[in-house]
Amino acid sequence: MLALPGSLYLRQGDEIALSDSDKPTAPLELADMVAEHTQVQSSQFGSPTATVRHAAHVRHEYNLACAPLAFVTGLEWCPPQTLSFLVRGVLVVVNTSDSPVTLPAEAKVLLSSQPLRQEEGRPLVPPATTTWLEATTVA
């Protein structure tokens, strides 16, 4: 959702991956919990907080908030079980399949919701993972 054009809204707790069932009902308890988790996660590479912050940085750098959006089909390396869309210079690939998606070797990954592994020098996008790519490296 952070790649979509328009205003960005996060509910309190989303930035630390806090589920609704884990949220305390008292607002001050929730604020304390978010502050505590944010402090811990800020220095952890790949943590929800670090990922949201990096996504916000890339969103600002590429000016995605006011960019046009286009759905993309026909990429040879992108199976039909994936959702792909282009926002300005960022190609977003959402792997909704049960298998990893192999990206082109020259793909420049800007952000990924899960760690990517490599196979023969090519990044693999695991199932249930969203990856942002610099569009000029994968067209």
Regions found by a protein language model. Give the residues of each.
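Carbohydrate-interacting/catalytic domains
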Residues: 2-11, 16-139
